[in-house]
């Protein structure tokens, strides 16, 4: 058994026990308990007790014990449940993806008239290049003056003329003569304006 040491409240000396006044008035009698055939005298103790079991009732200890056990079990069971939940969530995600893949052909069956429409490509309507048969990018057009076509000739005849060669030169149809001086070219651009009328009163 564990040894009990009593400390008096007033002087703090061990081994000295003083009965309180309230206990004397009530006529408290030491109670005798029989345990294992032995008689033990239990007297009311005053002061602090060291190395003694707590004075809580057994029901309270059991309740606290069951609460502690329940929390420990819940903590232990929470770990595997989280792992199971993650496995279930991954399974659900894979099932959803499989269902989504299987549902894609069903959408084509529900709308078969979409395939009957003409395909629309906006780049086809924004292409301003000439066809390959009428490309003029290969012609050396640097330094060429303004060209005026005869009314009898058509555009296709001009486009079918190949690049200029020194042996076969097509007839040049220029607006001005290449041998003219710049002053003569400027004189052709002069336009006669009507005479200024100064007689009008403003």
Curated annotation (Swiss-Prot):
GO terms for cellular component: cytoplasm; nucleus. InterPro entries: Securin_separation_inhibitor (IPR006940). Phosphorylated at Ser-165 by CDK1 during mitosis. Residues 36-55 are annotated as: Disordered. The keyword Cell division applies. It is found in: Cytoplasm; Nucleus. A motif (TEK-box 1) lies at residues 71-73. Its main location: cytoplasm. Keywords: Cell cycle, Cell division, Chromosome partition, Cytoplasm, DNA damage, DNA repair, Mitosis, Nucleus, Phosphoprotein, Proto-oncogene, Repeat, SH3-binding, Ubl conjugation. GO terms for molecular function: SH3 domain binding. One of its GO terms (biological process) is chromosome organization. The modification Phosphoserine is found at residue 165. A motif (D-box) lies at residues 61-64. Disulfide bonds: none annotated. It comes from the Eukaryota. A motif (TEK-box 2) lies at residues 94-96. Signal peptide: none annotated. A motif (SH3-binding) lies at residues 163-173. The N-terminal destruction box (D-box) acts as a recognition signal for degradation via the ubiquitin-proteasome pathway. The TEK-boxes are required for 'Lys-11'-linked ubiquitination and facilitate the transfer of the first ubiquitin and ubiquitin chain nucleation. TEK-boxes may direct a catalytically competent orientation of the UBE2C/UBCH10-ubiquitin thioester with the acceptor lysine residue. Regulatory protein, which plays a central role in chromosome stability, in the p53/TP53 pathway, and DNA repair. Probably acts by blocking the action of key proteins. During the mitosis, it blocks Separase/ESPL1 function, preventing the proteolysis of the cohesin complex and the subsequent segregation of the chromosomes. At the onset of anaphase, it is ubiquitinated, conducting to its destruction and to the liberation of ESPL1. Its function is however not limited to a blocking activity, since it is required to activate ESPL1. Interacts with RPS10 and DNAJA1. Interacts with the caspase-like ESPL1, and prevents its protease activity probably by covering its active site. Interacts with TP53 and blocks its activity probably by blocking its binding to DNA. Interacts with the Ku 70 kDa subunit of ds-DNA kinase. Interacts with PTTG1IP. PANTHER family: SECURIN, SECURIN-3. Belongs to the securin family. This is Securin. It comes from Bos taurus (Bovine).
């Amino acid at each position: 058994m564990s040894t009990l040491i009593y400390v008096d409240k007033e002087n703090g000396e061990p081994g000295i026990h003083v009965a309180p006044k309230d206990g004397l008035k009530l006529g408290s009698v030491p109670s005798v308990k029989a345990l294992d055939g032995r008689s033990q005298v239990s007297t009311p103790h005053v002061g602090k007790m060291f190395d003694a079991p707590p004075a809580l009732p057994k029901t309270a200890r059991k309740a606290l014990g069951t609460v502690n056990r329940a929390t420990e079990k819940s903590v232990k069971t929470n770990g595997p449940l989280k792992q199971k939940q993650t496995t279930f969530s991954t399974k659900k995600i894979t099932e959803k993806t499989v269902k989504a893949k299987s549902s894609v052909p069903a959408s084509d069956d529900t709308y078969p008239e979409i395939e009957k429409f003409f395909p629309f490509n906006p780049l086809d309507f924004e292409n301003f290049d000439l066809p390959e048969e009428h490309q003029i990018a290969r012609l050396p057009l640097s330094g060429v003056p303004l060209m005026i076509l005869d009314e009898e000739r058509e555009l296709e005849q001009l486009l079918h003329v190949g690049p200029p060669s020194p042996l076969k030169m097509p007839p040049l149809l220029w607006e001005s003569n290449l041998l003219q001086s710049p002053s003569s070219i400027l004189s052709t651009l002069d336009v006669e304006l009507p005479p200024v009328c100064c007689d009008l009163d403003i």
